[in-house]
Amino acid sequence: MDAIKKKMLAMKMEKENAVDRAEQNEQKLRDTEEQKAKIEEDLNNLQKKCANLENDFDSVNEQVQVAMAKLETSEKRVTEMEQEVSGTTRKITLLEEDLERNEERLQTATERLEEASKLPDESERGARVLESRSLADDERIDQLEAQLKEAKYIAEDAERKYDEAARKLAITEVDLERAEARPKAAEAKILELEEELKVVGNNTKSLEISEQEASQREDSYEETIRDLTQRLKDAENRATEAERTVSKLQKEVDRLEDELLAEKEKYKAISDELDQTFAELAGY
């Protein structure tokens, strides 16, 4: 009888131990399922964050493309301004050559006046009048030369400004190339994140750190784009200023051409008077 009681007691204890072990296993199972659910939730969150990063990357890439288009437009405008400056410089060169020819003609007229001064006293008064006019023309030509030098200086200054604008555009282009390289690095990082998602159970913490780093790089891209946009605005402002300078220079060239034409007409009048004076002297 005692043996039966002991056996029953042993069976009861074994049953209780089995129940305890079952409860422990059930608890472990629940804990495991909760851990699994948490890991799956973290995985879903990381996948969403990765998708958001891809969308943000596409947006940044579009902004870079827009910045490149604006840069190309600015470069075209600067090229056009350089061509206009080149044309204006050619006009100034032609004006200088024309002015030199006018000076040679005036020198010839002066020599003729000197010859006329050697004639009899009856022609001396007419020669003095012509000489006075010639001196006035000399002063006018000197004034024109000074104005032409000033216009040439303005053209050279405009060329220097264009060179500076071209240099800054080249720097902006280098910065833009760097900005293009950074999205490629971001794309490679996203691919790396996708690979790490396959082993999320062991690399969850590492993925979270990578996500934070990607977010920081995104902020850096946005800052770079803002800087490029500002530089493009500066380039556009410089191009606008160059247009105003070219317009001012063109007006100055037109004015010089008008004054040169007037000087030619004065020279023709002097030549006619000289011819008339020589004709009168020949009559004496």
Swiss-Prot record:
Region (Disordered): 202-223
Coiled coil spans: 1-284
Compositional bias (Polar residues): 202-213
Keyword terms of this UniProt record: Coiled coil, Repeat
InterPro entries: Tropomyosin
Bias-annotated ranges (Basic and acidic residues): 214-223
Highest rank taxon of the organism: Eukaryota
Pfam families, alphabetized: Tropomyosin
Family, per entry: Belongs to the tropomyosin family.
Oligomer status and interactors: Homodimer.
Entry remark concerning the domains of this protein: The molecule is in a coiled coil structure that is formed by 2 polypeptide chains. The sequence exhibits a prominent seven-residues periodicity.
Task of the protein: Tropomyosin, in association with the troponin complex, plays a central role in the calcium dependent regulation of muscle contraction.
UniProt name for this protein: Tropomyosin
Organism encoding this protein: Haliotis rufescens (California red abalone)
UniProt lineage: Eukaryota, Metazoa, Spiralia, Lophotrochozoa, Mollusca
